[in-house]
Design a protein with these regions (language model features):
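Extended hydrophobic secondary-structure segments that form protein cores and membrane-embedded regions
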Residues: 14-19, 66
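Conserved phosphate-binding loops in nucleotide/dinucleotide-binding enzymes
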Residues: 27-85, 99-110, 234-236
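Helix-rich, typically C-terminal accessory recognition domains appended to large enzymatic cores
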Residues: 3-13, 78-252
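Short, conserved secondary-structure transition motifs
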Residues: 18-28, 206
Length: 252
């Protein structure tokens, strides 16, 4: 419209990204009335019954986008109170590409909650190192460069995936971060490098799990306005590249 001179105000965005819907199973009683998930119970995940009448079997319908008319909705306030807002955000963004529908599941919600608990345990361990509660050899060596390289490369991955709306891939990147940092914490050296890299990691976590990231930054006494970390391009270069060779269909 702005380019066609229909409006004087320039539009703030180049385009609209339409995300998929959040879906849930549908349930009906024997009289064909819709039932809310809270009205349904199951002991084996296969057979469902009404909570107020365990003798009445529930008809499980197809998975459809959440709607009040079909009563297949989840109360956001209840879920947030139980698991926290960050867990909900993490689950919704991790399940599938944003243009695809997301199937709501209690198991997926619990998995996201547990992952944030693991990140919190990792944070406490790193904080203990920075506070001298865990002794390390505080000097620069090849481990410092490995830490710098991993952190810069993962930040670049997350930056690229954010620009492409690949939120589910970003969550996979978060698991890479956890696996690396939890494995390498016992080998960490040079506290300045640890703190600088970890703060940058918290910055790239913040779009997805902002409350967790902000709490961790607060505990590290980072009170200034945080900015998206700049990548040092020298760490993006690979000295070694693994090439798979196949001869007659077999890897050599």
């Amino acid at each position: 419209s702005y380019k066609n001179n229909n409006f004087d105000m320039q539009e703030p965005f180049d385009g609209l990204f339409t995300q998929g819907m959040v879906c849930h199973e549908t349930y009906k009683d024997q009289n064909n009335n819709w039932l809310h998930p809270d009205e349904v119970t199951s002991n084996d995940g296969k057979n469902y019954f009404k909570k107020d009448n365990l003798n009445e079997k529930v008809i499980v319908g197809p998975i459809e986008s959440m709607s009040k008319s079909k009563k297949n909705t989840i109360e956001p306030a209840k879920i947030i109170e139980q698991y926290g807002a960050d867990s909900v955000r993490l689950f919704i963004l991790s399940d599938s590409p944003p243009e695809k529908d997301v199937q709501w599941s209690e198991e997926g919600m619990i998995a996201s909650y547990k992952f944030i608990q693991k990140l919190w345990a990792l944070h406490n361990k790193i904080k203990a190192i920075l506070n001298d509660e865990i002794e390390i050899e505080d000097k620069k060596n090849e481990r410092t460069e490995e830490l710098n390289k991993f952190t810069n490369q993962i930040i670049q991955k997350i930056t690229n995936n954010l620009e492409k709306f690949n939120y589910n891939v970003i969550v996979a990147n978060f698991h890479e971060i956890y696996n690396y940092y939890s494995k390498e914490t016992n080998n960490f050296i040079q506290k300045d490098a640890i703190k600088e890299n970890y703060i940058n990691i918290l910055c790239v976590l913040s779009p997805i799990i902002p409350h967790f990231a902000q709490e961790c930054l607060y505990e590290l006494n980072v009170k200034n306005e945080i900015r998206w970390p700049k990548v040092n391009k020298k760490y993006l270069q690979e000295d070694k590249v693994e090439i798979v060779i196949q001869i007659n269909g077999k890897k050599r």
